Amino acid sequence: MKMPMGNSGMKSWRTKTGTRIYRVLNGRCNCYLVSKDNRFLLVDSGTKRDWNRLNKGLDKLGATHASLVALVLTHCHFDHAENAAMLKNTYQAPIWVHKSEGDCLRNGENPVIQGSIPVTKLMIELLNRTRRLGRLNYAPADYARLVDDRLDLDTFGFPGYILHTPGHTPGSMSVIIDNEIALVGDTLFGIFRGSVFPPFAGDPKLMVQSWKKLLDTGCITFLPAHGSERDKEVLKRQYDKYNQL
C-alpha cells in the first residue's frame, strides 16, 4: 500500500503487517529505508553528491548507528555504492553484498557496465574507447556479509528476505518485504511507461529469468532504483514479452 507523503516529506509504502518503506533518496538513484519496530535496513547508498541529502533523510527518520541494522547493496555500480564507505564510517553500518561482487566493493571497482539496447551498447562502446568508465570507481569499503542465493531477514527483525536476481550484474539482489513489496535495484527500471526493461544489463536473458523469480515471490509492488514503482501486472506483461525472444 502506498502512503501519502507525511511529515518526513518522503514517499513511503506500508505492508499489511505494518512494515514501512521510505524512499529516503531519489534522483540519480532511489534509495529505500525499511523500518520495522524502530530498526532500519537501508537499501543502496546513492552517489557522493547526494550524501548530505541521504544523511539528512536518515537523521529525520531516526536511523542511528544503533538502529541501522545494515546497508544492503543491490549491486556494486557506483551510483548504488558510492556512499557505502561513508555510511560505514558514520553509522557503523555493516554492508551486505552478493558474494560475486564482494571484491568489487572492497576494491571500489565499478562492475562492468553493458548496454542492453542498441543506443546504450553504442554509448558504452564510445565510453570504453575514451576510458571514461574507469572514472566511475569509488571509495572501497569492507563488507560484513556475503549473500548467496537467499538470506532470510527474520532473524534481523524484518519480515522478508534477500533474493539473488542476477542479470543486470552477476551479483544483483532484491529485497523482498512481507511477500508484498520488492526493492529491486536495477533488475527492472521504472522510467518508461509500461516498460521495466533496463537500458543496461550484462545478461538480459538471465535478467528476464530473474523477473520470473520476482513474480514468484507474490509481491504486488516493485520499487526500482531508477524511476517509479511498477505493479505486478506490468512486470508480468513484460516477462511474457521478453521471455519469448
Place the predicted regions along the sequence by residue.
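Short, conserved active-site entrance elements at the starts or edges of catalytic domains
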Residues: 6-10, 133-158
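Conserved beta-strand hairpin/beta-sheet module of binuclear metal-dependent hydrolase folds
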Residues: 10-61, 174-185
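Metallo-beta-lactamase
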Residues: 48-49, 135-136, 159-234, 238-241
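Residue-level marker for buried hydrophobic side chains located in beta-strands
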Residues: 41-43, 72, 95, 183, ...
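Soluble, non-transmembrane catalytic domains of enzymes that act on hydrophobic metabolites at membranes
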Residues: 33, 66-90, 102, 148-149, ...
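Active-site HxH/HxHxD metal-binding segment of metal-dependent hydrolases
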Residues: 59-145
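Residues at alpha-helix caps and immediate loop-helix transition turns in enzyme cores, especially N-
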Residues: 53, 83, 234-235
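Core catalytic region of metal-dependent phosphoesterases/phosphodiesterases
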Residues: 94-99, 238-245
